[in-house]
C-alpha cells in the first residue's frame, strides 16, 4: 500500500500516533509500516543500505569463485529444456548467460527427441526489454484453446516490470510473431496484482488491482471481472467479490471440451480458501473445509486435506489424496475414493493428469516413485488400479 510522510518514522526513528479514545485500547504502532511503499526512493535507499551490510559480512575470498560455479551450472547448455505442448508445438522458456531475461521458443516433436532441437525463437525478452526501456521478467504464457483442427495461435503473455507479483498481460500471436496491437482490439492489461484467463476468443476473466479496482488489505485483487475486447477494466462486468480483509481473489475458466467450467477462488489466507463454480449464472461454493486443497480434471474432483478430515465417519489424514465425481459431489454425494494415504516412509510430492490417467509423484524413504492410476479400473492398495512406472531413473 502507498504511505505518506506521516505514516513512517522521522529521521530520528520516532513515530507519532493519535491518542486513543477514552476506554479504547491503543492501536499498535508498526515502526516499519513506511516500508510498504516498496518503490519509494527513501525505502529503496534503506534496502540498498541493508544489502551493502549483508555483502560486507558475507563476501569473502571464496565468494566470487562460488558464485561463478553456481552460475556455470545455471547457465549450462546441458540442462534438459523443459517443454509444454500446445497443438503440434513444444514450447520452452530458456535463460542462460547470453540471454539472462530469456527466450520463448518452440520446436517440433521429432526435433526435440533428436537431442539437439532446432528452436524457433518467438520472443527475445532481453531484446524486448531493451526496446521498451523496461526490465521485463517473463512470467509465462496462457494459450487460448482454438476451435477443433485449428492451431494454437493466441496467447496471453505475463510480464512483471520488476520480478514482483504484479504483471502486465499482453496478447501475442505466435503465427504473426508479435503482440496484437491494442488499436486492433488486442488485449493489453495494465500492470496489477492478480490473474487473467481466457473465457473465449474475445473475452477474458480478470482479477487485478490495476486501474484502481478494489484491492484487499494484503494489496491483492479483491474483484473478478469479465473483460470483452475493446473494454477497459473499469467498464468490465464485475462477477466476483471477496471481503477486504481476505487475501486475494482469482477467477479462471477451464476450457476442456465437454467439461467447460468457470471457477472463482476466495483466498481467505495463505492456507485457507473457498472455491466456487459458476452454475446458471450463480456461484456455487464447493462444500469442503477451507484448508482442503481442490483441483478438477474432466469428471473428477481431487481433494488434498492439510489437516485430518472426517467425512461420513471416516477420517482421512492430512496429506491424503481423495477423489469424487465432480457432479456427484456438487449434488451432495460424499463417496470419496482414497487414492493415496501417507505413512511414516511415504509422502505425496505432486500429481499430474494425462487425458485418462493420474500420475502420482511419491517420495518413499527419500527416493522418488511414479505411480500411474487408472480411474476406470478398481485397485487393491488404492481405489484406482495403480502401477509403478519403472522406466524413470
List the predicted regions and their residue ranges:
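Charged, compositionally biased N-terminal leader segments and the immediate start
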Residues: 1-29
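Peripheral, non-catalytic segments that deliver or gate enzyme domains
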Residues: 27-61, 67-89, 93-110, 115-121, ...
Amino acid at each position: 500500500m502507498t504511505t505518506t510522510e506521516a505514516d513512517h518514522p522521522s529521521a530520528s526513528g520516532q513515530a507519532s500516533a493519535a491518542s486513543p479514545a477514552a476506554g479504547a485500547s491503543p492501536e499498535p504502532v508498526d515502526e516499519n509500516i513506511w516500508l510498504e511503499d516498496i518503490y519509494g526512493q527513501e525505502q529503496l535507499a534503506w534496502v540498498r543500505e541493508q544489502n551493502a551490510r549483508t555483502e560486507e559480512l558475507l563476501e569473502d575470498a571464496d565468494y566470487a569463485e562460488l558464485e561463478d560455479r553456481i552460475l556455470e551450472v545455471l547457465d549450462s547448455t546441458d540442462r534438459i529444456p523443459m517443454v509444454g505442448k500446445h497443438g503440434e508445438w513444444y514450447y520452452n522458456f530458456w535463460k542462460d548467460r547470453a540471454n539472462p531475461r530469456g527466450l520463448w521458443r518452440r520446436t517440433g516433436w521429432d526435433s526435440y527427441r533428436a537431442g539437439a532441437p532446432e528452436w524457433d525463437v518467438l520472443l527475445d525478452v532481453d531484446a524486448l526489454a531493451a526496446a521498451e526501456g523496461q526490465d521485463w521478467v517473463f512470467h509465462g504464457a496462457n494459450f487460448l484453446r482454438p476451435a477443433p483442427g485449428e492451431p494454437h495461435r493466441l496467447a496471453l503473455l505475463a510480464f512483471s516490470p520488476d520480478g514482483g507479483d504484479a504483471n502486465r498481460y499482453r496478447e501475442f500471436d505466435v503465427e504473426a510473431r508479435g503482440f496484437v496491437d491494442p488499436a486492433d482490439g488486442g488485449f493489453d492489461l495494465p500492470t496489477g496484482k492478480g490473474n487473467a484467463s481466457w473465457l473465449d476468443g474475445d473475452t477474458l476473466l480478470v482479477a487485478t488491482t490495476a486501474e484502481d479496482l478494489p484491492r484487499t488489505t494484503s494489496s491483492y485483487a479483491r474483484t473478478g471481472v469479465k473483460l470483452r475486447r475493446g473494454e477497459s477494466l473499469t467498464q468490465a462486468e464485475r462477477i466476483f467479490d471477496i471481503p477486504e480483509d481476505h487475501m486475494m481473489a482469482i477467477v479462471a475458466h477451464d476450457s476442456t471440451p465437454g467439461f467447460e467450467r468457470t471457477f472463482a477462488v476466495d483466498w481467505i489466507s495463505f492456507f485457507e480458501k473457498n472455491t466456487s463454480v459458476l452454475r446458471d449464472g450463480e456461484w456455487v461454493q464447493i462444500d469442503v473445509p477451507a484448508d482442503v486443497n481442490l483441483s478438477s480434471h474432466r469428471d473428477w474432483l481431487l481433494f488434498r486435506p492439510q489437516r485430518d478430515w472426517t467425512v461420513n465417519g471416516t477420517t482421512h489424514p492430512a496429506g491424503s489424496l481423495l477423489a469424487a465425481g465432480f457432479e456427484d459431489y456438487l449434488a451432495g454425494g460424499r463417496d470419496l475414493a482414497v487414492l493415496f494415504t501417507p505413512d511414516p516412509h511415504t509422502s505425496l510430492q505432486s500429481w499430474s493428469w494425462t487425458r485418462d490417467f493420474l500420475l502420482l509423484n511419491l517420495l518413499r524413504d527419500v527416493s522418488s516413485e511414479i505411480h500411474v492410476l487408472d480411474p476406470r479400473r478398481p485397485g487393491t492398495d488404492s481405489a484406482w488400479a495403480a502401477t509403478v512406472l519403472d522406466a524413470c531413473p
